[in-house]
From Swiss-Prot:
The chain crosses the membrane at residues 15-35, 50-70, 79-99, 109-129, 137-157, 168-188, 209-229, 249-269, 272-292, 299-319, 333-353, 362-382. It is found in: Cell inner membrane. GO terms for molecular function: carbohydrate transmembrane transporter activity. This is Probable sugar efflux transporter. Belongs to the major facilitator superfamily. SotB (TC 2.A.1.2) family. Signal peptide: none annotated. One of its GO terms (cellular component) is plasma membrane. It is a multi-pass membrane protein. Pfam families: MFS_1. Involved in the efflux of sugars. The physiological role may be the reduction of the intracellular concentration of toxic sugars or sugar metabolites.
Length: 394
């Protein structure tokens, strides 16, 4: 709840700025996917080796989300956001002047630490500053920020990287983050920490079987997705033999499809909660299984990316709403665990995709991701049967 009454316009403006912040944080997480080849060329490395930066980033977030959230649980939230942004901007400044791959990794670790705290607190903050009764819409706006990171942030970052160099991409992200920090400082009220939970909340949460089943579902599904998605740029160029410009276009429509998924979820997610989650995981799996056979057909692979992008967004929103519903008494701890587990999946998928491309071939990443996706779909169906509350959004 907000401590003082504000107009609906102001409330929505605050949510919008948090969504813009989400856009920035997700852009910097995802943009290396579109720059792997360029970064590899700068340091004379293979793309699979450069892909290690995706795994390290994700696993730093995974390992540090809960400890950083607990360490800062009593810090007033606006002040904490400012600290996060200062670390974020400084780390991007280092990325923009990185003289070797080790320096780049160090800068990415700094960004990952700020990311770890940001996603532990932001969903609950968006709900707190949103107009009364608009929780779902606030989360949907945050999700739109995430989707825009793929539809605008990632392809624009890739275009800047191709035109001016990947270092300039990181410099621009840092500059935009600095402006956003100043606007958030002006717009947000003081937000005392509340309902964060404590270290004691962790075993309590893991004694909730439905929540544990959901966390495992998230880990499996995200691992499956990122096994293929992490290497979509080199896959399209080296396996499909399509141009760099068309690769940028595919990244663009993948992200645009995520916005469609966000809108669909906000309208129909509460009406068909179980169907939406099962269908999303099924479509993610099908998309990866069909990636290789559709790769050389521009219309087919474009259609596939639209379906895949919609499904990934719906899946992400569906699990987030369920986590908040299953842990209303410790939202920040539950969300930090979600962020950590999600990033375990990102790191595992990026690592597995890299190993597949090195030891099998790049063409196989979709099939391996799809095989894990089938396991995820089976686990989802079983979990919903075993834990009926997972069939609902809350």
């Amino acid at each position: 709840m907000q401590t003082t009454p504000v107009s609906r316009k102001t409330a929505w403006l605050r949510v919008l700025m948090l969504a813009i912040a989400a856009f920035i944080f997700n852009t910097t997480e995802f943009v290396p996917v579109g720059l792997l080849s360029d970064i590899g060329s700068s340091f004379s490395m293979q793309t699979a080796q450069v892909g290690l930066m995706l795994t390290i980033y994700a696993w730093v977030v995974a390992l540090m989300s809960l400890p950083m959230m607990l360490l800062t649980r009593n810090v007033e939230r606006r002040m904490l956001l400012m600290i996060i942004f200062v670390m974020f901007v400084a780390s991007h400044a280092l990325s923009s002047v990185a003289w070797d791959f080790t320096t780049l990794l160090i800068s990415r670790i700094g960004i990952a630490l700020s990311h770890a705290i940001f996603w532990s607190i932001t969903a609950s903050l968006a709900i707190r500053v949103a107009p009364q009764g608009k929780k779902t819409q606030a989360l949907s706006m945050m999700a739109t920020g995430t989707a825009l990171a793929m539809v605008l942030g990632l392809p624009i970052g890739r275009m800047i990287g191709q035109l001016l160099g990947w270092r300039i991409t990181f410099a621009v992200i840092g500059a935009v983050a600095f402006v956003t920090m100043l606007l958030l400082l002006k717009l947000l009220p003081k937000l005392p920490s509340e309902h964060t939970g404590s270290l004691k909340s962790v075993p309590m949460l893991f004694r909730r079987p439905a929540l544990v089943a959901l966390y495992l579902l998230i880990a499996i599904t995200v691992t499956a997705h990122y096994t293929a998605y992490s290497y979509i740029e080199p896959f399209i160029q080296s396996v499909a033999g399509l141009s760099g410009g068309f690769t940028t276009f595919l990244l663009l429509i993948f992200g645009a499809a995520g916005i469609v998924g966000s809108v669909l979820f906000s309208i129909y997610g509460n009406k068909f909660p179980a169907t939406f989650l099962l269908a999303a995981i099924g479509l993610i799996t099908l998309s990866m299984m069909c990636l290789y056979v559709s790769a050389t057909h521009t219309l087919a692979v474009s259609t596939l990316c639209v379906i895949w992008g919609i499904a990934v967004m719906v899946m992400g929103l569906a699990v987030q709403v369920r986590v908040l519903a299953l842990a209303p008494d410790a939202t920040d701890v539950a969300m930090s665990l979600l962020s950590g587990i999600y990033n375990i999946g990102i790191g595992a998928g990026a690592l597995l995709g890299g190993q597949v491309s090195l030891h099998l071939n790049m063409a196989s990443v979709g099939y391996v991701g799809g095989a894990i996706g089938i396991l995820s779909l089976l686990w989802c169906a079983w979990s919903m049967k075993r834990h009926p509350q997972l069939r609902l959004n809350g």
